[in-house]
C-alpha cells in the first residue's frame, strides 16, 4: 500500500506532467484564464487519464507486447496508434456525457475538450506507463495521480491569472508574456519536490 501512495504523491508533485515535463502546455496556457473552466478541464483530464492509462496497459500487455498473443509475435510497433485510438474513443465518450449532463461546462471548454485527444499530457501519461513497466494497479494509481497533478497545475495557474487581472503588469508582458513567466516560476517551485525520494 505504501508503494501506491508513494507513486500517487510522486505523480502529483514530483513528476508533475505540466510543470516537470511541460506536457499539455497548449491547453494549460489557453484554458487557464478562469478557475471554473480550468477546474472543469482538470476533472476531464483526470477522468481520461484514469481510464486511458489502465486501458492502454491492458491492451499493451495482452495484445501488443512481444509474445502477448502468440510466441514470437511483437505488435509493439502499433502501440502509438493504438494508444491514440483508445484516448480518442474515451474523449468522445466524455464529450458526449458532458454535452448531455453538463452543457455549461461543455460550452465553456469549447474546442479544447476535443483537443484532449491530442493533448500530449494524456499521451505522455500512457507512454510513461509503458516505459516504466507499471502493472495494472500501478497504472490506475499513476493515471489518477498524473491527472490530479495536471489539474493542480492548471487550477493554480488559473487562480494566479485571475489575481493578475488586478495587477499592474508592464505593457510588454501583458497576456502570454507574464503567463509564461508565471508558469516558469511555478515549475521552479515544483522542482523543489524533486529532491524528495519516496
Curated annotation (Swiss-Prot):
GO cellular component, one term: Gram-negative-bacterium-type cell wall
Keyword Transmembrane helix: yes
GO biological process terms held by the UniProt record: respiratory electron transport chain; sodium ion transport
Protein name: Na(+)-translocating NADH-quinone reductase subunit E
Enzyme class: translocase
InterPro entries on file: NqrDE/RnfAE, NqrDE/RnfAE_oxidrdctase, NqrE
Reactions accelerated catalytically: a ubiquinone + n Na(+)(in) + NADH + H(+) = a ubiquinol + n Na(+)(out) + NAD(+)
NCBIfam families reported for this sequence: nqrE (TIGR01940)
Subcellular localization, as worded in the UniProt entry: Cell inner membrane
EC number, as in UniProt: 7.2.1.1
GO molecular-function terms, A-Z: oxidoreductase activity, acting on NAD(P)H, quinone or similar compound as acceptor
Keyword Cell membrane: yes
Family designation: Belongs to the NqrDE/RnfAE family.
Annotated organism of origin: Aeromonas hydrophila subsp. hydrophila (strain ATCC 7966 / DSM 30187 / BCRC 13018 / CCUG 14551 / JCM 1027 / KCTC 2358 / NCIMB 9240 / NCTC 8049)
Membrane topology: Multi-pass membrane protein
Amino acid at each position: 500500500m505504501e508503494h501506491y501512495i508513494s507513486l500517487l504523491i510522486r505523480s502529483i508533485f514530483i513528476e508533475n506532467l505540466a510543470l516537470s515535463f511541460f506536457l499539455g502546455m497548449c491547453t494549460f496556457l489557453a484554458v487557464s484564464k478562469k478557475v471554473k473552466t480550468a477546474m472543469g478541464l482538470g476533472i476531464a483530464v483526470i477522468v481520461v487519464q484514469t481510464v486511458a492509462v489502465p486501458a492502454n496497459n491492458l491492451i499493451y500487455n495482452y495484445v501488443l507486447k512481444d509474445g502477448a498473443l502468440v510466441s514470437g509475435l511483437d505488435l509493439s510497433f502499433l502501440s502509438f496508434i493504438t494508444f491514440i485510438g483508445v484516448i480518442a474513443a474515451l474523449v468522445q465518450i466524455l464529450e458526449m456525457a458532458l454535452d448531455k449532463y453538463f452543457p455549461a461546462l461543455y460550452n465553456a471548454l469549447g474546442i479544447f475538450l476535443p483537443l484532449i485527444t491530442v493533448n500530449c499530457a494524456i499521451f505522455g501519461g500512457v507512454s510513461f506507463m509503458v516505459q516504466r513497466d507499471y502493472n495494472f494497479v500501478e497504472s490506475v494509481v499513476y493515471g489518477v495521480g498524473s491527472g490530479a497533478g495536471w489539474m493542480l497545475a492548471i487550477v493554480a495557474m488559473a487562480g494566479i491569472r485571475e489575481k493578475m487581472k488586478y495587477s499592474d503588469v508592464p505593457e510588454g508582458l501583458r497576456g502570454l508574456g507574464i503567463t509564461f513567466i508565471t508558469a516558469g516560476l511555478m515549475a521552479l517551485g515544483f522542482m523543489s519536490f524533486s529532491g524528495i525520494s519516496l
